[in-house]
Amino acid sequence: GTFDRYDEDFERKIWSSTGVNAIEFNGLTDLANAGVFGEYTYHAGDKFSAIAGLRGDWFYGQGFKVSPRVTLKYTPVDEIVIRANGGRGLRYATPLVDNIGVFSTGKEFVGAYNDHILEDAWTFGGNITYYMPFGASSNTYVSFDYFRTQFAQQMVVDYELGHNQIHFYALDGERSYTDNYQLDFSVD
């Protein structure tokens, strides 16, 4: 488990045409979680392996949450490796700590900048690698990866919503995702 204590104490003065806008924030935040993790590994010769993991965490103020994950690896022939994996990730958002650059903008903070929501995301994807029979060693390959992260709960720092303002808000289940593609070629 972890125990993080954030003592956030700041005073910002923002000069504008309407005068000085002062924001003061003094907050001591304790973010605690305790958990246990276990995994099982299965091998079917040299062709297939699977790792299944399960993590259970108690989050302060949120209760007990379960985070499963699985990794699969299949090698149909020596030159080709296929991998797939997926799982859930949970963490407390720390909007000001995670986005320290907002202090240098001179913009007003609006919304939940001092909230520490529990972010919840699922990531899944895969990889296929083909090892090529040339180069100085057997490590010459071409590889393609695709991964998607789908957020069920996410803290957003929005620089675009308001003029001279930075908005902090939780998506609360609204659509938020990332898709990552990568093609890699390596000659050794």
Predicted regions and their residues:
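Membrane-embedded beta-strand positions of outer-membrane beta-barrel proteins
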Residues: 1, 52, 70, 84, ...
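Outer-membrane beta-barrel transmembrane domain signature of Gram-negative proteins
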Residues: 1-50, 169-188
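Transmembrane beta-strands of outer-membrane beta-barrel pores
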Residues: 3-9, 54-60, 86-92, 101, ...
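Membrane-embedded beta-barrel scaffold of Gram-negative outer-membrane proteins
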Residues: 9, 75, 81-83, 117-173, ...
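Outer-membrane beta-barrel translocator domains and adjoining extracellular loop/strand segments
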Residues: 9-18, 62-68, 95-101, 108-110, ...
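Solvent-exposed loop/turn segments connecting transmembrane beta-strands
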Residues: 30, 34, 57-67
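Exposed loop/turn and edge beta-strand positions of beta-sandwich/beta-sheet ligand-binding modules
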Residues: 34, 66, 110, 122, ...
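Residue-level signature of outer-membrane beta-barrel architecture
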Residues: 40-42, 56, 64, 72-75, ...
